[in-house]
């Protein structure tokens, strides 16, 4: 489950038009959502509130295995539509398998002029969190320098606790990190710097194929374009088959390919590293069939009385299964990783990953599954609470109210987690076990409860 601060940050990126998916660091994001989910350990409570669209507060407490807590504050320069935990779209609050949209060039905010002078300012986000009783302080500042450039500054201040036994002074754990991202849609470059170990890094991601149309192009397309104009002659002939054109070969997966690499160097440690990766994603975007069904017209009978139509109960299957295939290679460490993730049905996604080291011959095979839980259409409309806002039309496929994730690997680790919504709260419950240990088969178990309000 995403923390409240992460949810606000993603909402800020969406409001400002920044694509956080077009990064080399997120190359394996789809498979990681199924294979690397974080199981809560102990007992955690989080309460957050949005007094106004610009300012947010969040408080968290860990009761087990030790008592600790934190408080955080978030301020943004633009209004954010942050919903409450009872009304927010459930899938927006957790990492999940998804084939992301085609990359597009980021667009800046509209210019605002007053008395012949430009008065609009660039958007920014400020975030700070203080941990008790450790006294650690985290801070984040993110701003848009231009429509295609974003700067993020993160700082960590962790006071040194205790006196070392050998009398030597411990290394200061405080650190400041700079991150500069330049995204033009077709490619994205990321520059990073860490002051703790004087590490410099650069990441690059290139997308092959066409870019998604901008909002201006989409608007012009919706308003209609004169395809008979000379400049649009190619569009009018797009559907005409050439004499030498061959028929498309059926079968296989159609999609887009992205390749990237990263290079980093530490002046303090006098070490360097490099890695490269490739990703294949199917097209079009993996939107569920429920999102492709238009809302019923006023003349459509009420599904709660007459029942949904057979076409809605049996939606058209995917023309091709939503699939993501990735491969990473680190030549200096000798690490090779390949992953395959696909949605095999409407509510089930499967993933597998193989890791191998060419130097030590160590290998690991990991398998995972993601299964979405839905309420029946009739129960989802009849079980609404008093005063709760009901949807304008009931979903014929049922409302998603939970997800079950499972992971198993060849190192005998098995993880199982359930995430769902109980009344107005978001709840995560998970367990991690070690099948090779008879003395302690359960390594960790935990539950996390989150509640936030926008009123």
From Swiss-Prot:
It is found in: Mitochondrion outer membrane. InterPro entries: Mdm10. Residues 291-301 have a biased composition (Pro residues). It is a multi-pass membrane protein. GO terms for biological process: establishment of mitochondrion localization; mitochondrial genome maintenance; mitochondrial outer membrane translocase complex assembly; mitochondrion-endoplasmic reticulum membrane tethering; phospholipid transport; protein insertion into mitochondrial outer membrane. GO terms for cellular component: ERMES complex; SAM complex. Belongs to the MDM10 family. PANTHER family: MITOCHONDRIAL DISTRIBUTION AND MORPHOLOGY PROTEIN 10 (PTHR28035:SF1). This is Mitochondrial distribution and morphology protein 10. It comes from Coprinopsis cinerea (strain Okayama-7 / 130 / ATCC MYA-4618 / FGSC 9003) (Inky cap fungus).
């Amino acid at each position: 489950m995403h923390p409240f601060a992460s949810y606000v940050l993603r909402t800020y990126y969406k409001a400002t038009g920044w694509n956080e998916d077009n990064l080399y660091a997120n190359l394996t994001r789809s498979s990681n959502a199924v294979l690397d989910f974080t199981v809560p350990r102990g007992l955690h409570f989080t309460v957050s509130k949005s007094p106004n669209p610009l300012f947010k507060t969040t408080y968290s407490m860990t009761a087990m295995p030790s008592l600790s807590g934190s408080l955080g504050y978030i301020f943004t320069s633009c209004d954010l539509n942050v919903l409450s935990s009872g009304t927010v779209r459930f899938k927006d609050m957790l990492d999940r398998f998804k084939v992301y949209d085609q990359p597009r060039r980021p667009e800046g905010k509209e210019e605002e002029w007053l008395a012949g002078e430009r008065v609009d300012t660039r958007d920014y986000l400020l975030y700070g969190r203080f941990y008790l009783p450790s006294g650690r302080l985290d801070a984040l500042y993110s701003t848009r320098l231009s429509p295609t450039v974003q700067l993020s500054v993160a700082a960590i201040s962790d006071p040194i606790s205790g006196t070392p036994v050998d009398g030597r002074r411990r290394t200061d754990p405080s650190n400041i990190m700079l991150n500069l991202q330049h995204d033009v849609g077709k490619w994205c470059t990321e520059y990073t710097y860490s002051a703790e170990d004087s590490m410099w890094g650069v990441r690059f991601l290139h997308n092959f194929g066409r870019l998604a149309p901008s909002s201006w192009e989409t608007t012009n397309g919706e308003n209609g374009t004169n395809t008979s104009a000379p400049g649009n002659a190619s569009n009018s002939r797009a559907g005409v088959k050439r004499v030498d054109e061959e028929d498309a070969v059926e079968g296989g997966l159609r999609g887009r390919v992205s390749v990237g690499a990263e290079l980093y160097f530490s002046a303090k440690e006098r070490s360097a590293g490099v890695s490269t990766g490739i990703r294949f994603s199917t097209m079009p975007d993996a939107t569920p069939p429920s999102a492709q069904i238009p809302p019923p017209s006023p003349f459509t009978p009420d599904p709660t009385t007459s029942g949904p139509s057979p076409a809605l109960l049996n939606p058209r299957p995917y023309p091709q299964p939503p699939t993501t295939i990735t491969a990473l290679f680190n030549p200096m460490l000798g690490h090779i990783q390949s992953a395959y993730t696909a949605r095999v049905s409407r509510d089930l996604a499967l993933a597998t990953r193989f890791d191998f080291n060419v130097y030590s011959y160590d290998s690991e095979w990991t398998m995972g599954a993601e299964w979405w839980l839905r309420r029946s259409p009739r129960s989802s409309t009849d079980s609404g609470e008093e005063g709760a806002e009901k949807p304008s039309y009931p979903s014929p496929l049922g409302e998603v109210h939970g997800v079950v994730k499972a992971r198993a690997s060849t190192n005998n680790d098995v993880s199982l987690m359930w995430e769902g919504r109980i009344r107005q709260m978001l709840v995560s419950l998970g367990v991690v076990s070690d099948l090779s240990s008879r003395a302690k088969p359960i390594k960790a178990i935990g539950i996390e409860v989150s509640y936030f309000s926008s009123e």
